């Protein structure tokens, strides 16, 4: 009953000072919504396991080499690990790549994501089908034309409960549907929720490959997930797998030398993305912590003002025998109620924001919407974290005001205060304002650094011109073309597109720049080069035609480009970039020089040198790169590029029509090079948006905190201000005095924030592009922004009191 009486009394006090209460709850709701969103993202990316039974028993298995921090596993090694380990009940495998194909069922067709998996994929994960069955043991040993549908795709097909036994057709390959996964199963990787799974034994057939890649030990294509036996720890499993790695290295030194198995806890992130996700989450949580810190400082300042307004009540209670512990408890109850109100509002705001975030589906140019399966919605972990946050915030915001307001020298501390800067309470209030301003400055500096990084990325010399380039991408093999038919299709596609009015140039390539992968990695040795005398160099490459360079505006620096004479049976020639020429033939003319491709023991001759560019990622360092002729290196997947005389989107339909005339059944996607290059900036822009949101929150909190501090400090000095006016001081003089004192506090906070910003910049600079250790332009812009906010806030807060009747101020002070 005593506690309930205290709660009712605190609620009456907060209701009486409703303006202060509203500002405090608003500040905490904003900050705690940021905390809820930040922790939910962290929880979804790194804490929440796959939605399968006993997920803690699952570990992801990959390999490393001296030159690769992450690598897949070939099929023979997978079988060896699966059959010879002693720590796993079973081990599954799946290719890291997932692909899009039209899936035809009952005369209706829709593009879907499809993926090959080992026959034990669903059994290892513990996934029971909603209908039918999954794959059976032995399906990997012989091609088995079966398919398992995802719940969402089954719903799109009409949700037929008797669908098991019926067929779907993918690129003229018929598969029998054997089952449907439950709704709760969303795959093993966020961005790769397949619509259809088929056995690994069918992969070569599905891709119309003459040779099964599983027989090639150089194809490290697979990821593995193992389920630990009961009682087995991860260190024990790692030791067992690394022992098997040594056995494989001894048996197959050509492909497995120095290749070591590694394991990590299975999450919904690709293994090679976990470290980046941890860094991004750490930065996000650090920003959230700063925003919360600013909000706590703001509310603590407001509670100091509330304690000042309650000074007579607290004096009377102390005089009547209330202990200091009782006074502190009641003041902490006030702050806890404010934190609870802010926490409730913050949780609702976070829930609404996370609901929208869960529905977010990024669009990949040329391929459509990426079906992310990240569930950001709060779960029990987020709810517990938010409840703990309410308790911590209540303690953090109420402890300092409680200790101060219940001090033994209460009468001197709480009565008759005039000068803001000259009292103990004024110093505490100023310190809290400095903290808010410093935190806001640090967060705004972070926003500025992200903006500077994005501007630098947008100004990067890509090495090619993306403007006015329309493109089509198609898989000739998936469209039913043999290699001979595909080779004859190359010139037909070029000729058809070249006849379109407004098309200036047509080029072809097997991959796009900035695609996130290296096309083909070639192991080469250059005769006479120290760089490759001990170990072959790994050089990325792409196959292009003779018009590729002119279509994309890539400058020719030396030699020639490919010609019609460079046919399939002619000596293999390559064009290299400038960095490769400088690295392997320094001070020499590389034209006519030869190198040996170890992958196929093939001798190649350099015939031309072109300018450097960006090949895999927009923020990558300069790298050697080489080009093969499409006539000499056939590729089924090609990109047809057209340099147009205007907006390239207007040429996509004519290009599509031209190809449809060649083959009405041809399946392809359309996109523009500008859209593609802009997509490479998607993540930096998303990071900028997120940091800007938090920066805006910190700025609002700092402005609200500064307004409240000035408003309440001036209200406490109304007697002094009234006397000054009565003695002849003009309102302008009072304004200058208040502004001067406010600017001293703000300037100190900005200086502290800039110092913190320099430290933060050093910590995150590796995640930014082209950002100097100290970006003075960013720091100056933030300082000016904070200065402008100080002037406006101080004027708005002090104006009502400066216009008050001085005699009334003296009489009622």
Describe the predicted segments one by one.
Residues 38-41, 262, 300, 336-410, ...:
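Small-residue-rich transmembrane alpha-helices
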Residues 295-339, 409, 705-746, 750, ...:
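Interfacial "coupling" helices/loops that link adjacent transmembrane helices in transporter permeases
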Residues 42, 49-99, 219-225, 457, ...:
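Membrane-proximal extracellular/periplasmic loop immediately following the first transmembrane helix
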Residues 99-100, 114-135, 145-282, 355-361, ...:
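Mid-to-C-terminal secondary-structure elements
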Residues 1-22, 269-273, 302-329, 333, ...:
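Alpha-helical transmembrane segments of integral membrane proteins
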Residues 17-45, 294-297, 339-344, 429-453, ...:
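Short, strongly hydrophobic transmembrane alpha-helices
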Residues 1-23, 52-53, 64, 108, ...:
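Membrane-helix entry/capping segments
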